[in-house]
């Protein structure tokens, strides 16, 4: 067991949480709180602006479901992704969009990385800055994906750094994108983007 700082002010980070059975990381400062579902694609499930108590992320009516505990009842290729989609913000890689055949492997809606558990390591944990690295190796495709999330004191900004590496001996095409679903209460009749 490792020791983790438990501050009540400044920047804070903890990977000692689970939500609906999924390993969860909470990253925050005085202005924002970001909740990441490490065991489900390292999805950003919650992005809250604390001074106004506003969550920017849209959420499905059924909420968070653990893809490791779900057995699809159909062969519908879009099915598993939609069945466990909670809303929020996903990293799409190495494919995105509709199901496809990728070098002979069947890949479902929005790729495989969005439903896989990712590893996590806290890189920095100080009152001025917190940072966590998430990474995964995909099952059906030869890719290593890494993202680092950082929050600095005094900022209402989540810094995101991502990379994708083809670990195969031959070149491979890849799609790499962000699936960000904004919703109420942030999106309203008075919202301007």
Predicted segments with their positions:
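Surface-exposed acidic/polar loop and edge beta-strand patches at domain peripheries
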Residues: 1-159, 170-173, 177-193
């Amino acid at each position: 067991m490792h020791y983790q700082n438990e501050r009540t002010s400044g920047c804070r980070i903890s990977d000692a949480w689970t939500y609906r059975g999924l390993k969860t990381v909470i990253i925050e400062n005085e202005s924002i709180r970001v909740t990441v579902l490490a065991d489900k694609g390292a999805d950003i499930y919650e992005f809250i602006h604390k001074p106004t108590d506003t969550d920017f992320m849209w959420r499905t009516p059924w909420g968070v479901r653990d893809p490791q505990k779900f057995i699809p009842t159909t062969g519908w290729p879009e099915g598993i992704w939609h069945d466990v989609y909670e809303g929020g913000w996903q990293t799409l890689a190495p494919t995105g969009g509709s199901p496809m055949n990728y070098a002979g492997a069947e890949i479902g809606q929005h790729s495989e990385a969005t439903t896989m558990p990712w590893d996590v390591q806290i890189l920095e944990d100080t009152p001025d800055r917190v940072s966590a690295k998430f990474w995964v190796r995909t099952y059906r495709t030869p890719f290593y994906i890494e993202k680092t999330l950082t929050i600095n004191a005094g900022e209402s900004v989540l810094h995101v750094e991502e990379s994708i590496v083809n670990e195969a001996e031959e070149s491979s095409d890849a799609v790499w994108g962000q699936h960000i679903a904004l919703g109420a209460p942030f999106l309203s009749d008075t919202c301007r983007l």
